[in-house]
Amino acid sequence: MPHYTFIEIGTSDFETLLETSNDTDIGLSVEPLSVYLNKLPNKQNVTKVNAAISDKNGEMSIYYVPPEIILAADLPWWFKGCNSVGHPHPTVSKCLSEMGKSQDFIMCDTVPVKTMETLIFENNIESIGTLKIDTEGHDCIILNNYITYCEKNPALFAKTINFETNVLSLVDDQEAVINRLLNNGYKLVSRNVNENTVLEKI
């Protein structure tokens, strides 16, 4: 079973680990919206997974503004990175209201959902270099499920974990996840309440 250089969950189609990876890196790029996943480059050792990640297997609703509407309605380009499972993205809804734009621009699709355990099993993953998560408020749910799995399978704890920590998730939830990782042998590298938090395995 291979070592994966990276697993990136929630890629959209910009600033991805896939784009900066080299030809020897083995990775997974996970994105529930195929319109963005398909725009990413194809690399020999990187697998694209068209799914959402959560704490259960099945299906979930994802809310997003299609790229053609972003362009036609002259909406901010970063809307394409604001796709949210379970409910509309609060920043998108607020921005549309402030711009006097219709909330009907927000579409809803049903997408397949996998747990980290399923993702790891399906791809025969033995170890992970970097786990990067950017899922617009769903990061702590994914990480709590992942940590619980790794506590029984410690070799699958990633060397580096990078996840989004901003207003889309509660600070208490962020701190609880960080403390669980610290208790499992990580050290805090950087903590930014408006951007990302990074931890490394000691």
Predicted features and spans:
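Phosphate/nucleotide-binding beta-alpha loop and adjacent structural elements of enzyme active sites
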Residues: M1-I202
